[in-house]
Amino acid sequence: MQAFFIGTNSKYIHTALGVRYVTEYCRAYGIFAHMLEATVNEPVLSVLTRITEQIDACDGGDNETILIGLEVHIWNRQFVFELGELLRKVLPDCFLMLGGPEVMFHPVKIFDEARFADFIVCGEGEEAVAELLLRLTGYE
């Protein structure tokens, strides 16, 4: 299993702390976790290309399970939803997960709006995401 956590910031001077925490927490459990940061000012197709290139560079084989986590904030929601739709088309077999403050208050509504998503993580994600990944790989 490979996990890729994507943080989409409003500017280059911002950093996605949640993505960093989740990535490092998963690595502590032996999960192959990677992160990528982008901004809402980048073309969504450029970010999509960067994600797919990073996945290709870390390729563990045709049968490897891939999870992509997208962090959703009020300032990047539209961008992330567009990116999620494109990821679903380009990588139909991967798991797509949403997390962050914008999804935790109305997860059912978010699932209705973001039909591309397989999972939504509410609240602090470090433990929940690591547990999800371990269960997906069969290491409960």
Residue ranges and their predicted role:
Residues 1-2, 64:
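A generic secondary-structure signal marking the coil-to-beta-strand transition
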Residues 2-11:
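Nucleotide-activated donor-dependent transferases that construct or modify glycoconjugates
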Residues 11-12, 73:
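A generic secondary-structure micro-motif detector
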Residues 12-18:
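Short N-terminal binding/cap micro-motifs at the start of the first secondary-structure element
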Residues 18-27:
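Short catalytic helix/loop segments, enriched in acidic residues and glycine
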Residues 25, 32-140:
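Glycine-rich beta-alpha loop elements in corrinoid/cobalamin-binding modules
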